[in-house]
């Protein structure tokens, strides 16, 4: 049976995972599953707004309401607010506590259910909450040491993800700015007209029709599209007589056009 040191090493090894390896929809499902296996419990991770980032159900908690939390990927506002007031780990909370993960209607089904809440911090900020629970059996001191380590590890990962997202946003903005600076006034006018034709981020358009409507030549539109495509802002595909299919890859172009 793994001892505390071995379990700690398993948890800290999570930090070796690249941010790029995180899932898109529930980025911390794998992490929650790993924590659930190591600590022997159910686990979920929510951000500061109560959005579900990942969960693992090692033991079935047969309540429709808990399952609804995971299906909608959002915890109730009242619960999120109560959890946000937990500044240090609260361990072995009974089914009578407001922070129990067990809904009121399941108290008789899981009278010995226990919940542990651990705040997640990163860079001095509250980033979310780690919630673990069992249908019975208290979390031991060793378990709680692992919980503290787990919340720290998750905090570092969340902070890394925020940093990655910020860097990606800045990169995209820089690319858009550089591309816009290469466009003439007529080409900017063409780009604005083209993107207004799209249904969301993609759609079909006919360059000659747009050119006639805004009073420019078709070549201006073609040149503008080439510049945006070479910058990785859009993708285009000829549809022959039906026109051109266009898809926006870098949505920062929309914000930039608002300034035009």
Swiss-Prot record:
It is found in: Cytoplasm. Residues 1-159 are annotated as: GAF domain. Transmembrane segments: none annotated. One of its GO terms (biological process) is negative regulation of DNA-templated transcription. It comes from the Bacteria. Its main location: cytoplasm. InterPro entries: ArsR-like_HTH, CodY, GAF-like_dom_sf, GTP_trans_reg_CodY_C, Transc_reg_CodY_N, WH-like_DNA-bd_sf, WH_DNA-bd_sf. GO terms for cellular component: cytoplasm. Signal peptide: none annotated. HAMAP family: HTH_type_CodY. DNA-binding global transcriptional regulator which is involved in the adaptive response to starvation and acts by directly or indirectly controlling the expression of numerous genes in response to nutrient availability. During rapid exponential growth, CodY is highly active and represses genes whose products allow adaptation to nutrient depletion. This is Global transcriptional regulator CodY. It comes from Streptococcus equi subsp. equi (strain 4047).
């Amino acid at each position: 049976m793994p001892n505390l040191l071995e379990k700690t090493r398993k948890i800290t090894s999570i930090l070796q995972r690249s941010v790029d390896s995180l899932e898109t929809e529930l980025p911390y499902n794998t992490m929650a599953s790993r924590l659930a296996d190591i600590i022997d419990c159910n686990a979920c991770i929510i951000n500061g707004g109560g959005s579900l980032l990942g969960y693992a159900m090692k033991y079935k908690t047969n309540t429709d309401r808990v399952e609804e939390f995971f299906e909608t990927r959002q915890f109730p506002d009242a619960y999120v607010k109560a959890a946000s007031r937990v500044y240090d780990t609260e361990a072995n909370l009974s089914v009578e506590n407001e922070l129990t993960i067990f809904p009121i209607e399941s108290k008789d089904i899981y009278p010995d259910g226990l919940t542990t809440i651990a705040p997640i911090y990163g860079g001095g900020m509250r980033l979310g909450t780690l919630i673990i629970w069992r249908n019975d059996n208290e979390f031991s001191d060793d378990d709680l040491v692992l919980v503290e380590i787990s919340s720290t590890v998750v905090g570092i990962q969340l902070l890394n993800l925020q940093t990655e997202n910020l860097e990606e946003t800045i990169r995209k903005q820089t690319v858009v700015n550089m591309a816009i600076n290469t466009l003439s006034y007529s080409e900017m006018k063409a780009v604005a007209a083209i993107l207004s034709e799209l249904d969301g981020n993609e759609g079909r358009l006919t360059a000659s029709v747009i050119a006639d409507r805004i009073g420019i030549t078709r070549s201006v539109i073609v040149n503008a599209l080439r510049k945006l495509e070479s910058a990785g802002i859009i993708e285009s595909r000829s549809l022959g007589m039906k026109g051109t299919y266009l898809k926006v890859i870098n949505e920062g172009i929309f914000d930039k056009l608002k300034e035009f």
